Amino acid sequence: MPRVKHYLINERYEDPGMFLQIENIGDYILFDIGNIYKLDRSLIKKINKIFITHTHMDHFIGFDYLLRLKLGKQQVVEIFGIYPVAENIYHKLQGYIWNLVEFEPQIIFLVKQYKNGYFYHYRFDIKKKFKKEFIKRTKAKNDVIYENKDYKVNFAVLDHKIPVLGYSLEFPDKLKLKKELIRELPLKGYEIGKLKEFLEDSRNKNKKFKIGNKHYSYKELLEKLTFTQKGIKISYITDVLGSKENIEKITRLVKDSDYLYCESVFLEEDSEQASKVYHLTTKQTAEIAKLANVRNLIPFHFSRRYGKNTNLIFNELSKFLEDTDIKIS
C-alpha cells in the first residue's frame, strides 16, 4: 500500500479540513482550507495542492494564514475547486499591497476552476502582484480533476444550495517486481525496465520475453517475478444536502473507499434542520457508507448544537452501522 498519511486537522465540531501527505513523492495536500492553525507550520509550508469543496468561510478562511507562511518560499501551489474559487482567491490576494515583491522568492498559485463541464486555468504570480492571468480552458473528462503517474483525484458536483465539489483520491493497484529474484537474472538496468513494461501490458499475454538465451511466457514471468501492491482510495465529502440525487452521486464517487471522510452534522432527530441548511444526518452518512461499501468511515463537521459531546454522533452512527463491518474512527 502506498505510504500515505491522512487525518482531520481540527476537532469534529470545528472547521472541516483534511491533510494528506504522500512523502515519497513530495505531495502535501489539503482538502478544504478552513482554520488550519492546528496544522504544524512546517507542514503548511510544504503544502503544494489544495482541493476546495466551496468557499463558505469555514472552508476557506485559512487561505490568508497559508499565504503568510508561503511568503519567502519559492513554490508553486495548485488549487482546485468550483466557480467562483478563482475569483475568491483573486480578491483575497488583492486585499494586500504587493510592492517590493521584486525582492521576494517567487510564489505562484495555479488555480483550476470547474464550471459547466469545463476547467478554467488561472495563474497568480507574486512577481506580477498576483494579477489574475487566464491560461486556458479545457474540457472536463471522466470526472477527473487531477492526475499524475501515481494517483488521480475524481470529483462530483453536489448540491449545498450552491454547487460544491466532493473528492476521491485513488492510488490504483500496482504491479511490482520481486527485487530479490530480479537481481538473480542476467538483465541490465534498462532491460529490467523493458521487462516491467512487458509485464504491465496485458496485451502481451500471448507473447514471450527473452532472458539470457531463453524465452519465457508472459504468464510464467508474471506469476514468478511480480506481486500486486494494493492501492488505496480516500474520499472527502462535506456540506451536502441528503437528497436522493446527492446520495447517488456521492455513492458512485466514493465506491469502495478504504477511507471515507464524510460530514455527519446532525442527529436523525434533527433531520428537518439538516434539510433546511443542506447538511447530512447520521442516518444519511451511514447510508452512504453502506451503499458505497467503504471500509472506514471518519465522520466530522458535527453541529455545535451538541457542544463537545461527540459521542452523540458516534453512538448514533454505530447504531445505524451495527450490521456492517465498517469501522468508525
Where are the regions that the model predicts?
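Active-site metal-binding motif and surrounding structural segment of the metallo-beta-lactamase
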Residues: N35-I82, V101
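Conserved Walker A/P-loop ATP-binding site and its immediately adjacent core
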Residues: P84-N88
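Binuclear metal-ion centers of metallo-dependent hydrolases, dominated by the metallo-beta-lactamase
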Residues: I108-R123, K224-F227, K244-S329
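Metal-dependent catalytic neighborhoods of phosphoester/phosphodiester hydrolases
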Residues: F63-L69, K92, I97, G307-E316
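Active-site neighborhood of phospho(di)ester-bond hydrolases with catalytic His/Asp-centered motifs
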Residues: F31-I33, N48-D58, G81-I82, S235-V240, ...
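Active-site-proximal loop/helix segment associated with metal-binding centers of metalloenzymes
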Residues: H121-Y236, V240-E245, R252, Y259
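Conserved beta-strand hairpin/beta-sheet module of binuclear metal-dependent hydrolase folds
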Residues: M1-K45, K49, V76, Y167-L169, ...
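Active-site neighborhood of divalent metal-dependent phosphoester bond hydrolases
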Residues: V76, I89-T138, R305
